[in-house]
Amino acid sequence: VGGPAIFTHKNYFDGVAKTGGSYPDAVKKHNPMATFASRGCPVGCWFCIVPAMEGRTFTEIENFIVRPVLCDNNLSALSSDYQNHIVSRYKKTDVPLLDANSGFEPRTFDEEVWEKINKGPWRFAYDDQGDGPHVERVMKMLKNVPRSKKRVYVLIGNEPFESCMDRIYRVISWGGEPYVQPVMKLNA
């Protein structure tokens, strides 16, 4: 047994199941089409469990198994060299990237790197008003992509109601599809 729930509730399965340890390629049990090319995230958003679970530095998995769903935590924050490494691995294996599942950081997104291989939706976060100019820049880059393929996770509950609604409406006006994500305590 593993995952974020076990990380925050370490003793929940005591006496019932084995927890902890390492289980390489565990994502395959959940989704046989999924893979990770890196773990961790240096951004350290206050509401995110990734830095606590996986660290605030990236662990690059050089020889990751190429599969159609890429679940990395923050693809566009990876070094340019490693992003290019991921893209070249997909090209060499001729496996289509159907879903860059975890998404891209709007502040560091470079469409040119990923447009060559991403066949699925584009996912971004719009966590607070400060992200506005960066999300708008990304939406302009992707203006020719259908609305349904521009998915923006809009965090709510972290700013006043009016600010949260403003961000939702901005995503719509910029041609994106808002996915509202309520902020939750990490131990909830």
Q: Which residue ranges define each predicted feature?
A:
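Anion (oxyanion) recognition and catalysis
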Residues: K91, K143, Y169-S173
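Core AdoMet radical
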Residues: V1-I6, I49-M141, S148-G157, E177-P182
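Conserved, mostly hydrophobic/aromatic
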Residues: C41, C45, F124, V171, ...
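Glycine-rich beta-alpha loop elements in corrinoid/cobalamin-binding modules
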Residues: V1-A34
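Auxiliary Fe-S-binding modules of radical SAM enzymes
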Residues: N158-A188
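Extended, charge-rich low-complexity interaction segments
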Residues: T35, V43, G132-V135, M184-L186
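Local cysteine-cluster metal-coordination motifs and their immediate loop/turn environment
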Residues: F36-P51
